[in-house]
A protein has these predicted regions:
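Conserved Lys-Pro-Asp/Glu-containing loop-to-beta segment of HAD-superfamily phosphomonoesterases
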Residues: 1-5, 49
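Helix N-cap/beta->alpha junction signal
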Residues: 5-8, 53
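TOPRIM fold recognition
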Residues: 15-94
Length: 94
């Protein structure tokens, strides 16, 4: 399960991964992190966090990592971009 802050980030990730199949959760706002934590607790060993590389994303990621200790933060793969969508847009060759 891969958790994203926004829908465009999830679509961008799917574009980057091509045919690889994943299950996704889109928060649509970091204010939904508490609800997401409760829903994700049964999946403890299978959670990747890919929230935004900004202050709100950092706070939400820390809170989720505290509540879901086996979750893995994968935001670094898209640094220094703010999020996956920005990463995709800045690396597209037309």
């Amino acid at each position: 399960m891969i958790v994203f802050e926004g829908f465009m980030d999830m679509l961008s990730f799917a574009t980057l991964c091509g045919e690889v199949r994943h299950n996704y959760v889109v928060l649509n706002s970091t204010s939904m992190k508490e609800e997401a934590i409760e829903a994700l607790k049964p999946l403890q060993n299978k959670i990747l966090l890919c929230l935004d590389n900004d202050e709100g994303g950092e706070r939400a990621t820390r809170m989720m990592l505290d509540a879901l200790p086996s979750a893995i933060d994968i935001r670094g793969r898209f640094a220094p971009s703010k999020d996956v969508n920005e990463y995709l847009c800045s690396n597209v060759i037309i």
